[in-house]
């Protein structure tokens, strides 16, 4: 085909076989690697991480479908014609003189008919529209570059999420020594009741309570902002919040392994973070729409995840401060140990889950920034007009690195600990085997209720609570302390 290179009919068989074998080998190696990782997670009872791996496979499958649609529909898309005037509006770069003769100097959304042809059929598509006095809505070259960008974005998001969870987990594992110190104590209930704790002398209160009044409240926010950059969580914070959680949800088991629960809860949340949800794809589309020359959208966009991350980190730190203020303002001394009271009221819109949504968006936004930078760098070069001036590029890269480090070592560990201070606990409070038994039992109970198989079953449903609904709530969105009767709490408390 003219200008398109030789077809498969006239390509040496050894070339076809070689290229095919390399592509298949790489694909097979990646598939085996994912399979082995899944097998490892299953053998080690890490079902939350296995779920996250399944989510990654779903994302890769979605990218595969997008790739297939672009490949199959590219010739049809290239034959959609629009007026030349319309094609020159909302460009990411200013069109240089003689752009029709030089594809190299044009942007990836520019439409050219006489430049290089990445795929056979580019010229016919251009000729098809030029005969009508119009231009293709998108050239095959631009479609090919968009294809590459979507793939780079998905891979970058997965890699950055993995790095974040790995570094965050390393930080949380440092807290294990505090958990071990607590578990080594001899828990004597009578002794605990007899002792009194002077609130103002408690280390947690001394480090978090600054006083009462507007000036002290403002200073508390400043302290919370600064603390996320330093020691975001210290030993007194961890031990106090651990005691608050155990006292609220596992009162009969003071030796509940809170650290192990944190790790399970974090792994469970990870599979929600690693995916690219529909609203994130909407964000990508909006960015591609608004990436107009002279607007510098790419530069200003870099500040969104940074501002959100600082706001989330400050809020999480301030929740710890609020817990200290609540005790210090009400008590001079308390009987037994100092205990904080978890509550959803501490969080924005009374929703601890909102924090996970924001972290998800922050990680994706940062991944998008880095992926877009490297895509432009390798596809069009450093001098590309989309890359913009150096004064805009360097700050973006610096901000991206700061976000990645701060989110990994400060915000994510803070999230893992502080969100346990809500009114509800997560299904991760049970180990994986117990969760499976409970879910299975709940499903069986629910089917029994629906069928109404026997009169006894019907009578039981009419006179007693419906455990299936309670357990579904527990293992899905969590279950508040108030919704659990003492017997259920006792059973929960002995699972770590």
UniProtKB/Swiss-Prot annotation:
<feature type="topological domain" description="Cytoplasmic">
    <location>
        <begin position="169"/>
        <end position="269"/>
    </location>
</feature>
<feature type="compositionally biased region" description="Polar residues">
    <location>
        <begin position="455"/>
        <end position="485"/>
    </location>
</feature>
<feature type="topological domain" description="Extracellular">
    <location>
        <begin position="377"/>
        <end position="397"/>
    </location>
</feature>
<dbReference type="GO" id="GO:0016020">
    <property type="term" value="C:membrane"/>
</dbReference>
<feature type="topological domain" description="Extracellular">
    <location>
        <begin position="1"/>
        <end position="9"/>
    </location>
</feature>
<dbReference type="GO" id="GO:0005516">
    <property type="term" value="F:calmodulin binding"/>
</dbReference>
<feature type="topological domain" description="Extracellular">
    <location>
        <position position="291"/>
    </location>
</feature>
<dbReference type="Pfam" id="PF03094">
    <property type="entry name" value="Mlo"/>
</dbReference>
<feature type="topological domain" description="Extracellular">
    <location>
        <begin position="81"/>
        <end position="147"/>
    </location>
</feature>
<keyword id="KW-0112">Calmodulin-binding</keyword>
<keyword id="KW-0812">Transmembrane</keyword>
<feature type="region of interest" description="Calmodulin-binding">
    <location>
        <begin position="432"/>
        <end position="453"/>
    </location>
</feature>
<keyword id="KW-1133">Transmembrane helix</keyword>
<comment type="function">
    <text>May be involved in modulation of pathogen defense and leaf cell death. Activity seems to be regulated by Ca(2+)-dependent calmodulin binding and seems not to require heterotrimeric G proteins.</text>
</comment>
<feature type="transmembrane region" description="Helical; Name=7">
    <location>
        <begin position="398"/>
        <end position="418"/>
    </location>
</feature>
<comment type="similarity">
    <text>Belongs to the MLO family.</text>
</comment>
<feature type="transmembrane region" description="Helical; Name=5">
    <location>
        <begin position="292"/>
        <end position="312"/>
    </location>
</feature>
<keyword id="KW-0611">Plant defense</keyword>
<feature type="topological domain" description="Cytoplasmic">
    <location>
        <begin position="419"/>
        <end position="496"/>
    </location>
</feature>
<dbReference type="GO" id="GO:0006952">
    <property type="term" value="P:defense response"/>
</dbReference>
<feature type="transmembrane region" description="Helical; Name=1">
    <location>
        <begin position="10"/>
        <end position="30"/>
    </location>
</feature>
<keyword id="KW-0472">Membrane</keyword>
<dbReference type="InterPro" id="IPR004326">
    <property type="entry name" value="Mlo"/>
</dbReference>
<feature type="topological domain" description="Cytoplasmic">
    <location>
        <begin position="313"/>
        <end position="355"/>
    </location>
</feature>
<feature type="transmembrane region" description="Helical; Name=4">
    <location>
        <begin position="270"/>
        <end position="290"/>
    </location>
</feature>
<keyword id="KW-0568">Pathogenesis-related protein</keyword>
<protein>
    <recommendedName>
        <fullName>MLO-like protein 15</fullName>
    </recommendedName>
</protein>
<feature type="region of interest" description="Disordered">
    <location>
        <begin position="454"/>
        <end position="496"/>
    </location>
</feature>
<feature type="transmembrane region" description="Helical; Name=3">
    <location>
        <begin position="148"/>
        <end position="168"/>
    </location>
</feature>
<feature type="compositionally biased region" description="Basic and acidic residues">
    <location>
        <begin position="486"/>
        <end position="496"/>
    </location>
</feature>
<feature type="topological domain" description="Cytoplasmic">
    <location>
        <begin position="31"/>
        <end position="59"/>
    </location>
</feature>
<feature type="transmembrane region" description="Helical; Name=2">
    <location>
        <begin position="60"/>
        <end position="80"/>
    </location>
</feature>
<feature type="transmembrane region" description="Helical; Name=6">
    <location>
        <begin position="356"/>
        <end position="376"/>
    </location>
</feature>
